[in-house]
Amino acid sequence: MVHCAGCERPILDRFLLNVLDRAWHIKCVQCCECKCNLTEKCFSREGKLYCKNDFFRRFGTKCAGCAQGISPNDLVRRARSKVFHLNCFTCMMCNKQLSTGEELYIIDENKFVCKDDYLSNTNGKDSNLLSVTACSDPSLSPDSQDQLQDDVKDAEIANLSDKETGNNENDDQNLGGKRRGPRTTIKAKQLETLKAAFAATPKPTRHIREQLAQETGLNMRVIQVWFQNRRSKERRMKQLSALGARRHAFFRSPRRMRTLVDRLEPGELIPNGPFSYYGDYQSEYYGPGGNYDFFPQGPPSSQAQTPVDLPFVPSSGPTGTPLGGMDHPIPGHHPSSEVQRFSDIMSHHPGDSPSPEPGIPGPLHSMSSDVFGPSPSFTSLSLNGSGYSNHLSHPPSEMNEGTVW
């Protein structure tokens, strides 16, 4: 004989119900709260049967306002991690029902003040006010009860402030300003998961963020803010690396002065130099190497073809030892004017311009009479097709006129 699990009497009916692996009379399968018959679906807890509404009202998510259970068919509003009935989500001062998206201020985690009442009472002493944005949810299904506190919409929080910072003396003056919310500590394993997801997709979709929230256990808002900060950091690093590369290229590769030898080919004229000099110049008036007769020490070497090292200065004695460059000019003289004057002398026609006397000691003493005193004597040059007809001789008593043919 089969006995009923509800009334413990034998079942003599033609039909019976099997609930929780036990036999029941049809009339005994009813809600223990409202006593309604359960024909299609029932919920059980601790061996008792409940209808859907009574089960969620008693064991489901509680309203933060009235502390009663929320039915899956009820419309609710959310503020941070709290869920409220529509009728319970009201301002504590004016009892106005707050709508979706309206800015409000939280007092003691479950009491609200609308923005108008808060602004009209800014001299209040409560420093634990939190400014949030209300969010509504049309229904709560049984599958979403466990994730109710973690599932926060992207635009839920407008302005957050840390409740722990309310003990400061200046909180009364900073109530209307923007404050930082509580800081979230991300563990190493969670950080590795987020970095791997960022490497795959720097801008994840909402579906990907939901998966990351389930894997890491973090709030979706925290994940979204982490990705935003990470993208901003990547942009800053790229800008800094590009700027550093430009600075490195500018400071590590300056334009260095190179010698004239590196920039000139053999026989090329020195550009913009004070000496019009040809290495291997040939013409009908000057033979090969004719210009070298001017230098007592022979043609200048390639290592001494800079403007300051050219041994064009005549020697001070019969041995022909050069006096050196123009590194140490005579006090009171102007080397730049001397070089320019020498360039002007050398740039004229050889038959019409006098040449400096090689026997006069001292650098560039034959340049100008107004700088160095009385003008030295000059000698004439007679030119032919094979070169100079004679070398510079000792200074005669007067200047002679040369003939050119």
UniProtKB/Swiss-Prot annotation:
Q: Where in the cell is it found?
A: Nucleus
SMART domains linked: HOX, LIM
Q: Where is the composition biased (Low complexity)?
A: 314-325
Query: Keywords in UniProt for this one?
Result: Developmental protein, DNA-binding, Homeobox, LIM domain, Metal-binding, Nucleus, Repeat, Zinc
Name the DNA-binding stretches: 179-238
Record-level GO cellular component terms: nucleus; protein-containing complex
One Gene Ontology term from the biological process aspect of the record: positive regulation of embryonic development
LIM zinc-binding domain boundaries: 4-54, 63-117
- The answer, when asked if Calcium is one of the entry's keywords, is no
Known Pfam families for this protein? Homeodomain, LIM
What PROSITE patterns would the database entry show? HOMEOBOX_1, HOMEOBOX_2, LIM_DOMAIN_1, LIM_DOMAIN_2
Classification via SUPFAM superfamilies: Glucocorticoid receptor-like (DNA-binding domain) (SSF57716), Homeodomain-like (SSF46689)
Q: Which GO terms describe its molecular function?
A: DNA-binding transcription factor activity; DNA-binding transcription factor activity, RNA polymerase II-specific; RNA polymerase II transcription regulatory region sequence-specific DNA binding; zinc ion binding
Note the InterPro entries from the entry.
Answer: HD (IPR001356), Homeobox_CS (IPR017970), Homeodomain-like_sf (IPR009057), Lhx1/5_LIM1 (IPR049618), Lhx1/5_LIM2 (IPR049619), LIM_Homeobox_TF (IPR050453), Znf_LIM (IPR001781)
Q: What is the first-listed, main subcellular location in coarse terms?
A: nucleus
- Protein's UniProt keywords contain Cell division: no
Q: Where is this region: Disordered?
A: 158-184, 296-373
CDD domains recorded for this chain?
homeodomain (cd00086), LIM1_Lhx1_Lhx5 (cd09367), LIM2_Lhx1_Lhx5 (cd09375)
Under PANTHER family, the record lists: LIM/HOMEOBOX PROTEIN LHX (PTHR24208), LIM_HOMEOBOX PROTEIN LHX1 (PTHR24208:SF106)
Reported function: Seems to play a role in dorsal axis formation.
What is the protein name stated in its UniProt record? LIM/homeobox protein Lhx1
Species of provenance: Danio rerio (Zebrafish)
**Gene encoding the protein:** lhx1a
